[in-house]
């Protein structure tokens, strides 16, 4: 694969230098190379925010016998802490939990303990295999600008945040669709107004999403002493149609265009 090593803007475009030494010329460059974007850094675009939240998460893709439905994502707000169990297309499940110390490679016994202490109590779910496991911490950052002349940011190069609420993919797709339209306008007519609108509006949306994901993370990882009150409050709110509808619209981002 080609790897960008640097970028330089010219009077009518930009030049991207690859790690092979090859130089590519383009009218515009979209930096969509992830949180550690080399293009963003080379362009001098800041990436402000919290480096990490003081939380540790474990993640394991596991095969399970019994106990968990294969057609819905479950969030267990248990007294020991949150456990997310999400079915995957191949029949396995992804387990995610906030823990004191996250192992680099969780094994079957570790995943089973999470299920036993935080998962469904009325059924028995048995972990038979860990397909893949890891650990992660949360970064919350938004680029201070999405555009510098011929360089435009999109996706994780422009924003990174907690996975709470599943907002990341929607936000990245929104970037791609909106930026595609803006670039088409700029390339066909030379009008860059839509690029400016993309840079302003997409950054504002990213700030909103980062704030929402932060609040959801704080709610999900509440201190043990207030978890019973949190759980009771969420249980009561779940009976309110307006609350359910509003939450669904927030998570689906259908109220923001």
Model region roles, listed by residue range:
Residues 1-5, 19-21:
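Conserved SAM/SAH-binding loop
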Residues 2, 15, 28, 32-134, ...:
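Conserved FAD-binding catalytic core of PHBH/FMO-like flavoproteins
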Residues 31, 130, 134-215:
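Conserved mid-domain beta->alpha element of the FAD-binding
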Residues 38-42, 92-94, 150, 202-206, ...:
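Short, cationic motifs built from Arg/Lys/His that form the positively charged side of catalytic pockets
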Residues 100, 166, 181-257:
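C-terminal helical "tail/cap" subdomain of flavin- and related membrane-associated enzymes
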